[in-house]
Amino acid sequence: MRDGGLMKISRALPRMSWHPKNLYNLFLRTVDSKNDHRRAITFGDNSIRSLFQERWVSKTVVRAYHGDHINEKIFKQWYLPDYLPDVRPRRKVFGDDKASLQEFAKRRQREKALEEEEQTKGLAPIGSLMFAEVERRLDVLIFRSCFAPSVYEARRLVVHGNVLLNGKRHYNANTRLAPGDMFSVKPSAMRILQPQREKGESDNVIDHPDAPPELTPFNLPFYASPWLFIPAYLEVSFATCSAIYVRHPTARPQYSEVPTPYGADGEVIRHAWEWYMQNRPRKRTESQWSKMPDDRLRRQMEELRLGRNSLKLATSGI
């Protein structure tokens, strides 16, 4: 771990980790404590904080979980989206000549039923999509695939050359993957697949003396079950220790694919978004674009654009 104070209970900041202290910190942040105003995140009339303090606290707790190992300046410049998608229903206005045809075809009734269903379900929680670019990072995807007990361990696996990206050894943990990319982790480098050193290190304390010696050991850390889930945008194969980044995370009514310990469209995420909208870089120069972290999707788009330009030049010369 790069910093011993990451899991301090006095700070109570949830991280991307399976550590037991991290689960307790998550409990302290998600359960409202009336006696501890420093840990409880309250808004509105019952809050003792100003609007600036509410936004600052929201930004702090949100960034502690979503990419705390990313420099704040780099996060605001390259990982923060320019805007969030608009999910408000678009009302259609038709002329008098089309109204009679729609009533005849019963399209208006179907549209009304869809609008009522949309109002019942509510709008999609898009607030958590502000961290969609962070979810594309290779180290974060390794943690989401449950191949590493923390995002810091996942970063160590990449830096030490234990990860293959599309069949080639990859050392850059900052790489953002494109849909269709496949990454694999070396099983011998995964700590959960190593022999148990001490009796109290794992929940897997049942001995099987009759088991063949060639079976791979599996030692699950204590209190890891709340973090064992796979997002919908990943296709994971535990038999081969590999996964495919299928598509970008999205959201639909009452569901967001970006995992977060806070409400996907709650006040914490909203206040954090308001903070970044007021404190973000205004533009990117050519020199700044050259310093951008590795993005495979942007690289593929540039290669496609160059291929189209070369094709146009080749056809124009014929």
Q: What role is predicted for each listed range?
A:
Residues M1-S145, N172-I318:
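Ferredoxin-like alpha/beta domains used as RNA- or RNAP-binding modules
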Residues D139-R144, R156, H160-N162:
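Contiguous, well-ordered alpha-helical segments that form the cores/surfaces of helical PPI scaffolds
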Residues V151, H170-A173:
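Active-site metal-coordination segments of metallo-dependent hydrolases
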Residues V151, L157-V158, V163, L177:
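Short, well-ordered loop/turn sites that connect or cap secondary structure elements
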Residues L165-G167:
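Short strand-turn-strand beta-turns centered on an Asx-Gly dipeptide
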